[in-house]
Amino acid sequence: MKQMAAQKAWTDEERLELAAQLDAELDAFIDGLEKKRYEEGWPEDRWQEEMDKHPFFMKRAPQPGDDVHPMFEGLQKLKYDPEENTRDELALNYKEDGNFYMKHKKFRMAIYSFTEGIKTKTDNPDVLAVLYNNRSAAHFFIKNYRSSLSDAQRALFYKPDYTKARWRSAQCAYELERFDLCTQMCEELLEVDVDNEVAIALLHKNKMKKLEIERNQRKEAAEAKRRLTRFHRLRDAIEQRAIKFDDQKVGKKDVLSEELLYPKFLPLEDHPVHLDEDGSTLIWPAAFSYPEFLYSDFYQQLPETTTMRDCLATLLTEKLPYDKAHNYRLGNVHVYYENRKVGCVHKVDEEKQLAEIIAEKGFFVSGGALLFYVVHKDSRVEQEFINERRRPMVYS
């Protein structure tokens, strides 16, 4: 065999020169290849957006209305297609979705997923019990206690020894103030685990709340009875005095109601007519209007034994805000009341008590209060007020 020629000894400069030559030849080869645009990938300006849509890289589940990646649609079909899954598998897939939403506190989406699982009509009672219990939990977290209780009870129907569902039932029953059911659920939990601390605590809390509500109900019932008794006494006193109300229809005597006695004037609305402590004197809310100034004064509690002069003495102690001439003073004013039924006014005798004025044939309580008009005596304002055209009230 022929001996091979001895290898050439390369210097460093020769090696560098050869490497540069090979790089240049490779670049020339690449530049000589046919140019073709890359069109099969994601556009550079939407690369991140497309990445987020891809089922392998997405960071969150698609929301309603989002564009869904075709691969994601395919995976969904594999997961939810009835032809690809049994009823149990479909129910478990929806349960898995619901648990995912529960973990991320998307409780309404969780309710939707668990509901879809129930709709699969799986025959597995354990799966149905879990779906109902989990949907009960989702309802509970958004305070849909009635729906939560209903689902927890359904879970117990499919799985009578389901501790979680029984505890959820107890919690919902407490929130809904169904105290007997809460007691029953807690006692059943304690039959299984006598040392169940949360059940013991809820049982005690439930008992205390029941006692408190029953006590409050007794107080409210007693107060309602007292209020009704006071109203009946007030009604009898008003009827005995034959007091008339302009809200009552002509020719008809309506049964007196609290609404009829309720003052319609804002400053008086919390001070309806009532009897004094000994039950002998009516205390009235009253309004005194000054037509000249479009201004009113209010008495929140005015005994019927008060004379009109006493009322004026109090009202006119200080100068009225708009009375620059100081015409409105005791002895220099007249007081009227209006009979809206027939559309006329009546002058008030200042020496009479309110009870006497109210008893006059033409006087009607207006809007739950006594209403009087004060005008400057013998003035143009008084004449205009008296002669003002008034239309009688019309009732059907």
UniProtKB/Swiss-Prot annotation:
Signal peptide (from-to): none
Compartment(s) of residence: Nucleus; Nucleus, Nucleoplasm; Cytoplasm
GO terms classed as biological process: protein folding
Sequence ranges of the TPR repeats: 91-124, 129-162, 163-196
Entry keyword set: Cytoplasm, Nucleus, Repeat, TPR repeat
A single MF term (Gene Ontology): Hsp90 protein binding
Expression tissues: More abundant in young embryos, pupae and females and a lower level expression seen in late embryos, larvae and males.
Gene Ontology CC annotations of this record: cytoplasm; nucleoplasm; nucleus
Family membership noted in the UniProt record: Belongs to the TTC4 family.
Subunit structure: Forms a complex with Hsp83 and Hsp70aa. Interacts with DNApol-alpha180; the interaction inhibits the activity of the DNA polymerase and occurs only in proliferating cells but not in quiescent cells.
Lineage: Eukaryota, Metazoa, Ecdysozoa, Arthropoda, Hexapoda
InterPro entries the record matches: Csn1/TTC4_wheel, TPR-like_helical_dom_sf, TPR_rpt
Function: May act as a co-chaperone for HSP83.
Residues annotated as transmembrane: none
Keyword Oxidoreductase annotated: no
Protein name: DNA polymerase interacting tetratricopeptide repeat-containing, protein of 47 kDa
